[in-house]
Amino acid sequence: MNYNKKSIEDIDVKSKKVLVRCDFNVPLNEGKITDENRLVGALPTVKYLMEKGAKIILCSHMGKPKGEPKKELSLLPVAKRLSEMLNKEVVFADDDNVVGENAKKAVEDMKDGDIVLLQNTRYRKEETKNEEIFSKELASLADVFVNDAFGTAHRAHCSTVGVTHYLKEAACGYLIQKELKFLGNAVETPERPFVAILGGAKVSDKINVINNLLDKVDTLIIGGGMGYTFLKSLGYTVGDSLLEEDKVEYAKEMINKAKEKGVNFLLPVDITIADRFDKDAEPIVTEDQNVKEGYMGLDIGSKTAKIYADAIKSAKTVIWNGPMGVFEFKNFANGTIEVAKAMADSDAVTIIGGGDSAAAVNIFGFGDKMSHISTGGGASLEFLEGKELPGIAALNDK
């Protein structure tokens, strides 16, 4: 995939109507936004366009309204909060049809530097099917398209891909530019040693990621629930731990591939186990890689955490996707904390691949110590799988 895409700085936006696809899919509680990270992430692009005198039309989806208006998934709270953050009114074009009379009128009345936010794009069933009719309607509002929603870049929808067929100029915003810089460099031209850490519950979620990264990394570290399928493939007992029986053979193949490629493949040498899945369960650290009957692995052990931390310390590039254990339970958060700490203390380029690892890093207070925290869980996984992301591919090359 070509990562060298035109950015907003490469196009003249003065007095032009610029449709910006943002990711405002934020959590709401009784109409209040509970996590503003995605709004903060959009600000640099919006501010740049304001300064350059563009007419800014923002659009995004929120949740899954399944192609019909749902009041609780309206973007009104986003418009209100953005107005406060930008110190400028963001006009909300409340329109069940997204591009109806309200939206058209709001756009018509715009002056340079003004901002309009359209209603939830998924109010229209055509959006997720990438149907021409809605793509054309969205494109009809603007002269230029800017995609700044990395979180939906792996989806070919009207507001991410379809519009680019009807607007000649399509560029990326600062958020996507940063994602492409960090993830693209890591996958294509990493500084070495290059270490990837994969955790989370399932091997099946990361099959293509493991396979693709083994062609690129110097060390691959495995933790989390997926580790037990690998340990089982080596003949260890896993007790009641999470196990994907149908992936044991695949795990064996990957361990062999690592040997062939000369990749250092690290698995847990000890495990923090408990007799039940409960935040108050007593944590016991095993002597070796075996989990006894009646017990389940809920975190990597302390010896393993030290080995993983040492591997991170010697790296020049580190990518992490997926926690080492059940970090939501204090008794089983240590492995995840130790990995985050080692990355925070490192001089390497450190990249967190979105999702649960991003949540963990922020909860434990290491967020600002990382080089980059990806804003897209699914998108960053597909990126690491080596797949082309439709929302990026659709933009103009430099």
Curated annotation (Swiss-Prot):
Cross-referenced Pfam families? PGK (PF00162)
Q: What is its main location?
A: cytoplasm
The cross-references to SUPFAM superfamilies, in alphabetical order and at most eight, read: Phosphoglycerate kinase (SSF53748)
Gene Ontology CC annotation, any one: cytosol
- Binding of ATP: at which residues? K206, G297, E328, G354, G355, D356, S357
Q: What class of enzyme is it?
A: transferase
Q: In which pathway does it act?
A: Carbohydrate degradation; glycolysis; pyruvate from D-glyceraldehyde 3-phosphate: step 2/5
Residues that bind substrate: D23, F24, N25, R38, H61, M62, G63, K64, R122, R155
Q: What is its EC number?
A: 2.7.2.3
Its GO biological process annotations read:
gluconeogenesis; glycolytic process
According to its UniProt record, where is this protein located? Cytoplasm
Keyword flag Kinase: yes
Give the quaternary structure: Monomer.
Q: Which HAMAP family match?
A: Phosphoglyc_kinase
Q: What is this protein called?
A: Phosphoglycerate kinase
Which organism does this record belong to? Clostridium botulinum (strain Loch Maree / Type A3)
Q: Give the gene name.
A: pgk
